[in-house]
Amino acid sequence: MTLQAPHTLKFVYRFDEGNASMADLLGGKGSNLCEMARLGLPVAPGFVISTQVCRDYLTKNQTLPEGLGESIRDNIRLLEESIGRNFGSTPSPLLLSVRSGARVSMPGMMDTILNLGINDEIVEGLASMMGDPRPAYDAYRRFIQIYSEVVLDVDPEPFETVLAAHKEKAGVTLDHQLTAEQLQDVVADFKQITKDATGSEPTYDPWEQLMAAVEAVFRSWNTPRAIFYRDHNKIDHDMGTAVTIMAMIFGNLGPSSGTGVLFTRNPSTGKAQVYGEYLTNAQGEDVVAGVRTPEPIASLKDVMPEIYGELMELAENLETHYADMQDIEFTIENSRLFLLQTRNAKRTALSAVRTAVDMVSEGLISQSQALLRVDAEEISRLLVPQFSDAISQDVLDDRFLARGAPASPGAATGTVCFDATKAARLAEAGVDVILVRPETKPDDIHGITAAVGVVTSRGGVTSHAAVVTRGLGKPCIVGCEAIQVDLEAGLFTAGEKTVKEGEQISMDGATGSVYAGELETVSPSLEDLPEANELLRWADQTRKLGVMANTDTPSDAAQALVMGAEGIGLCRTEHMFLDPKRLPSVRQMLLNAETAETWRRESNDRVFRAENEPDSSQAVKDFYEALDQVRKLQTDDFNGILRVMGARPVIIRLLDAPLHEFLPPYETLLVELMELRHIGAPLAELEEKETFLHLVDSLRESNPMLGHRGCRLGLSFPAIYRMQVEAIITAGAQLVKEGLDVNPEIMIPLTVDVEEMHRLREDLSLVASEVQERQGVKVHYMFGTMIETPRAALTAGEIAKESEFFSFGTNDLTQMVFGFSRDDADGKFLRWYIDEGVLPNDPFASIDPQGVGQLIKIAVDAGRRERPNLEIGICGEHGGDPASVAFCHEAGLDYVSCSPFRVPVARLAAAQAALSGS
């Protein structure tokens, strides 16, 4: 069935009609082949069916547009003329490869069909043309298998089983060791497998094969693995794939033929040396699929020195032309080199950073280009774990299992799992999994993504497993041939050692070593990565946004400085309360707060002085005793953090969390009370427990996150906020006396009205003045608020009258704007919303520009109109998300704040936002 299409739509582009700038229309593979052809490089002739045809096909009931078949036939005729072979003809037959290729590289996620155009008659003509029936029948059996799998949806397992049986019968281990006669038997068995599965053998009509293959490639855009990959990598689902149709180049014609993949630099380390591998007497899928372990590319120099020299020259020229590391696929047919593809290479974070920095020094790109070239998220992957130096060599020797090729760096420890689906399920349950396979396939993508590392017994450093894990930043070891995987028994052997599924192993993707059991891992320091520091130095010179960190302890503050933070954007004081040694005092303070506040109001006294209040209740005395203990602890806390940060700003949020977070659960206390009654505990103990239970019950709320917390606590129980401000200013004064410059900024949380800010600021300013007078020094401080409710955003102009800075608490603001509970939504419906396209992104991961973002812009504009020098930033988890950082730059914020380990990400993302907006 065909569909009428506008005559203006051009379906097909010859290689001489395109160039590298046409990736949206011709896909990355097609546009780069056009570019290489334009440069006069040795590319097999072919043409590209555009991505627009794919989009039309998928949106119009999987119907090819009218006229496409005719366009394909016209271009096949041109192909025949250029190569001197005939498609669908026995003499000098032309076979085709039909390959997918979207604008964004998706290695192995879509389908490819090779050796198309063959049948029982044409295989004889191919054998005659090749002068050898073995490669002809090898091509035929490959075609039947891949066509059956991709076009007819036949299970691949029976083909692999039959092929293995034929090799065993012949007494050989490799596919190319089978003779022509043996391959004819394989062909017959493969036909029968297809017939058993579908009711008929694959079509013998080359034109039917071709059109069915084109449709199959289009359909592969929406396979589960392709959708999963796009979801994981945030790739647009609507771009579609092009289809590249090329004359087949045969790498399986004998020892003077072969195929391989090379990178112009090391994709794991970024070292400026050609890196890759090849197979003689093979086709390209053998290398990528990892079914054979290839030879390193350097050894090609000894086998085919002229081809090696030509290949090195082409690799250098392509990298210079594209000004980026290239991933090049090539095939050698009877000592003649052909390039099948070039693309910007997938690489590890370390390689991405090193390549970008080195290319600046080599004059290939500018600093700005280098900053835009490295994905900001990649920076966090630089700090991949490594084995601890404390592990002795004796332990490593004792635990050693096997060594393979290091394909992607990083150390990991996990539970052995042999199945991708099971690995994903275990990972979802919180289990660290290492996926161990003979080789991985594109359908394993969900398991690879879920695993902490991947080990394969076959394949090379350019195989599917290696390419995908490098892109994911996960450790990977390939070609670990000492490991024999028995999938049926659920175990693998390495020499005399056996490891069963469910047992622990450790792996080092940098050395290729696999060890039994669990080994300690540590994360490296950013200080040890000179190229990363150079790139981030350029980022700091470029960005307009400040980058601060969310930290609560002096050690975290020191780590934040190492990561490049310019201050602390959020210090959560309630986290200091949760230390088990402090909880008794904190609980004593909170449980008696209401009684103490009632007494204070009745006595009309701002400050409690025990020696002057002999008639106050024990509860009041307990409250102020606990308050004093907590004040001393908080003073020490703030002293430590302010000391580490020096003159940098430190934004300290006053107590925000609901009180129940510091108290035992009501249900737990109730059970404890029942147990005391059951054992006949003393009356005094029972009364104490009952009093505690009553107090906890009085503080319980139906919806505590929208209840008695934040500034509402500060207004209800002013002594708590006064204590905290006294501790902050006292700590600052202590350091000022030592000659240090400090800049605490006091943040009042959860305001909804300017009157809250007015009352609290007036009261707390008095406390700050009293402390400074008592200490005899001045401390530079500011008061500001956290904008985390819609009303605060909408009335920001009024609130700015009492605030010297705003900090958007985007976690709570997102919850309130959407009406979603962050703790519950993901597991209940949010993931489904995103998968089904109800929402484009997780609003808790990236700022929602239409809702939350609009409120932020309203607040920024209103706040700055009232107070032009108002300091504005965000301190939610969004502060380390590159998309959110870009939004903050556009919205005119002064800074973002995030966890210390996300600071480098934010620094680079802020520079990229500045460059993209300039």
Predicted regions: what is each one?
Residues 2-396, 421, 431-434, 441-443, ...:
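Nucleotide/phosphate-binding sheet-loop regions of phosphoryl- and nucleotidyl-transfer enzymes
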Residues 99-100, 526-534, 538-918:
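Conserved alpha/beta-domain cores
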Residues 214, 383-389, 393-414, 533-552, ...:
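Flexible inter-domain linker/hinge segments
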Residues 403-443, 494-534:
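Extended, non-globular alpha-helical segments
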Residues 47, 457-459, 478-481, 571, ...:
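Short beta->alpha connector loops at strand-helix junctions that form conserved
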